[in-house]
């Protein structure tokens, strides 16, 4: 015990600023300062991920398999909605995600608190914002050229299982195969497609 247990309830709510499981306006906090802490935490989490020099490879090699296993890439509803057909499809939608979701959070929902970080950097320019732009520009080039092989970085994977990343991909591929086997076969002819 370190004597901070009274903060547990509020911290348990503040941590939701880093996720998407709740709408931000559903996070109930009594003190305005707690909302500011939530904005700072949410901003730090989002900016650190987007600025990571291996962000694109992590989306491809880790986030997509996690989305598959979590039922996000292939929706678990009866209609089997497919949001991301592949890791490349996820990356192809990342620019839109940044514009419509991440940037909206940073600029509006989190009240641009990333500006406070700028005071710590030379000439007030945040390397995080610079690296986010660099990642998104590079991704746009990869998409335009269709050259996914340019994503060559292999970020370290710190998990107890030395084959953890490989195992994650195997599980995700099995989930996709299971889903595919349940889908109706495409019609073999135009007559079959029209029900004749």
Model-predicted segments: where are they?
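Divalent metal-dependent phosphate-bond-processing catalytic cores, especially two-metal-ion Mg2+/Mn2+ enzymes
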Residues: 2-6, 16-196
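Conserved, carboxylate-rich catalytic/transport cores that coordinate ions
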Residues: 9
């Amino acid at each position: 015990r370190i004597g901070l247990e009274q903060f547990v309830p509020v911290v348990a709510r503040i941590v939701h600023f880093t996720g998407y499981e709740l709408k931000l306006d559903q996070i109930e906090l009594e003190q305005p300062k707690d909302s500011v802490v939530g904005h700072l935490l949410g901003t730090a989490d989002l900016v650190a991920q987007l600025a990571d020099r291996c962000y694109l490879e992590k989306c491809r090699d880790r986030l997509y398999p996690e989305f598959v296993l979590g039922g996000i890439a292939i929706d678990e509803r009866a209609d089997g909605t497919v949001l991301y057909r592949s890791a490349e499809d996820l990356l192809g939608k990342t620019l839109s995600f940044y514009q419509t979701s991440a940037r909206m959070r940073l600029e509006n929902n989190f009240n641009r608190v990333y500006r406070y970080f700028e005071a710590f950097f030379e000439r007030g320019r945040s390397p995080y914002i610079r690296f986010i732009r660099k990642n998104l520009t590079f991704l746009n080039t990869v998409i335009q050229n269709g050259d996914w092989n340019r994503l060559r970085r292999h970020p370290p994977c710190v998990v107890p299982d030395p084959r953890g990343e490989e195992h994650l991909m195997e599980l995700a591929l099995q989930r996709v195969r299971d889903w595919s086997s349940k889908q109706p076969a495409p019609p073999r002819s135009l007559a079959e497609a029209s029900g004749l």
